[in-house]
């Protein structure tokens, strides 16, 4: 049994809790969020505009969240170093704040007594792992990153294509649902002026490090991929459009077959495959990291193709966070 604590009770933190409660070998002992009181934590966990009402009993006793009779301690500390992780016997702290994402800041959880930390964001300094791609390279590191939702969608597909046909170079676009950092109406966003525009009424070009990060989890693709994002007014589910120049000539049917084979093998929980006439909402709550849309891709020539893959950027990603927790435990 692995004891975990969740720091940051936002979109990812709450879904990680939902998913972890379903796993028999995980015991969630605590939640910390300086901005959320215990009664509000109960409300936010119970009601979700995107994924629906939680299907169990949720209440609180003033200091614990009570879910189906199970107590989870709730704290409101700004500094993770002050949390009682040692006393609570926390094996792994899941940091989903988006704030403590480097080795030095995530170390605060170790200082507080946690044995290991899983960061739910890309990191410049912590080793990044994408389940289904490079988790076998994990070598006991105390602090790891689960990379980003988009890297989790792109990397498995890039690996399949590179292993089978070779990728000379490629460009990725993610058409990405809105997230909490965006604005409901035009407002100040000093680092990213476009990002400060109304989320619900615009298609907003944005940067993403997701494609470059693939080179960190798959060194053979280092320097071969880069990408950008368009933020669009949907609440959840995003789609990766990967345009690649192949090393080896292939037919589109051969590419489809290669992905389908992987989706039916040991990576069936990570890679999905569909030939149906699907749209984004069809993937709400999908637990795969990536679902290859065989009917949407196109080919110009034997070495030049555009591939399309869907992902629930909240739920699929949060599922992988919990998988990585189990793996590093």
Swiss-Prot record:
Its EC number is 1.2.1.12. GO terms for biological process: glucose metabolic process; glycolytic process. It comes from the Eukaryota. D-glyceraldehyde 3-phosphate binds at residues 148-150, 179, 208-209, 231. InterPro entries: GlycerAld/Erythrose_P_DH, GlycerAld_3-P_DH_AS, GlycerAld_3-P_DH_cat, GlycerAld_3-P_DH_NAD(P)-bd, Glyceraldehyde-3-P_DH_1, NAD(P)-bd_dom_sf. Signal peptide: none annotated. One of its GO terms (molecular function) is NADP binding. It is an enzyme of class 1 (oxidoreductase). Pathway: Carbohydrate degradation; glycolysis; pyruvate from D-glyceraldehyde 3-phosphate: step 1/5. It catalyses: D-glyceraldehyde 3-phosphate + phosphate + NAD(+) = (2R)-3-phospho-glyceroyl phosphate + NADH + H(+). It is found in: Cytoplasm. Disulfide bonds: none annotated. Its main location: cytoplasm. The active site is at residue 149. The keyword Glycoprotein does not apply. The modification Phosphoserine is found at residues 148, 177, 200. NAD(+) binds at residues 11-12, 33, 77, 313. The record marks 176 as: Activates thiol group during catalysis. Keywords: Cytoplasm, Glycolysis, NAD, Oxidoreductase, Phosphoprotein. GO terms for cellular component: cytosol; external encapsulating structure. Homotetramer. Belongs to the glyceraldehyde-3-phosphate dehydrogenase family. This is Glyceraldehyde-3-phosphate dehydrogenase 1. It comes from Kluyveromyces marxianus (Yeast).
